[in-house]
């Protein structure tokens, strides 16, 4: 008795097993974290590996303001972001932070270092805490991209239309306002 492959007999697990990017530094990090996730029985390394293998759209940026807000209650921990840490001009004072990220923008790096904090790379983090102790994993909002606004669910929200122009006549009348016949 075999399995019916047409009726989803053998469903493969989703998620990437190998890195698609050609970036040599990222490839070395994946190799390092594959080793660590195999040799240590801590889930931190497995999660970091999973996030390193993700496509770029899931490595969403995280601003300094969100980062400092999350790290308020954990001043002795290192914030680990598998993505980019960006600057936020709305913040007047940046607290002392210990940050590990794939990339930190130039202005964000200057502000973190000026406040007495430190910016680490992932290999420096492994040397410091290979099991992920005293580390807090953070991530940016993946649904905040401009492209995501165009394919929202019909039930939850109105999807943003792809319009050729933003004038009065272009997709702003019938079906968009109650004053113009009806609103969906």
Curated annotation (Swiss-Prot):
It is found in: Cytoplasm. One of its GO terms (biological process) is translation. InterPro entries: Ribosomal_eL18, Ribosomal_uL15/eL18, Ribosomal_uL15/eL18_sf. It comes from the Eukaryota. GO terms for cellular component: cytosolic large ribosomal subunit. Keywords: Cytoplasm, Ribonucleoprotein, Ribosomal protein. GO terms for molecular function: RNA binding; structural constituent of ribosome. Pfam families: Ribosomal_L18 (PF17135). Belongs to the eukaryotic ribosomal protein eL18 family. This is Large ribosomal subunit protein eL18. It comes from Theileria parva (East coast fever infection agent). The lineage of its organism: Eukaryota, Sar, Alveolata, Apicomplexa, Aconoidasida.
């Amino acid at each position: 008795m075999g399995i019916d492959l047409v009726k989803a007999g053998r469903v493969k697990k989703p998620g990437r097993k190998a890195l698609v990017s050609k970036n040599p530094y990222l490839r070395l990090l994946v190799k390092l974290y594959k080793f660590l996730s195999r040799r240590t029985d801590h889930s931190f390394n497995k999660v970091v590996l999973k996030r390193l293998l993700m496509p770029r759209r899931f490595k969403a940026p995280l601003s300094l303001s969100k980062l400092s807000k999350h790290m308020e209650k954990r001043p002795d921990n290192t914030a680990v972001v598998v993505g980019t840490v960006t600057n936020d001009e709305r913040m007047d004072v940046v607290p002392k932070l210990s940050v590990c990220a794939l990339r930190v923008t130039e202005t964000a790096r200057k502000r973190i270092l000026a406040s007495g904090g430190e910016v680490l790379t992932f290999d420096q983090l492994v040397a410091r805490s290979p099991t992920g102790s005293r580390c807090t994993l953070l991530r940016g909002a993946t649904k905040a991209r401009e492209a995501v606004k165009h394919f929202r669910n019909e039930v939850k929200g109105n999807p943003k239309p792809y319009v050729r122009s933003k004038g009065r006549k272009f997709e702003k009348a019938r079906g968009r306002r109650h004053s113009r016949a009806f609103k969906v």
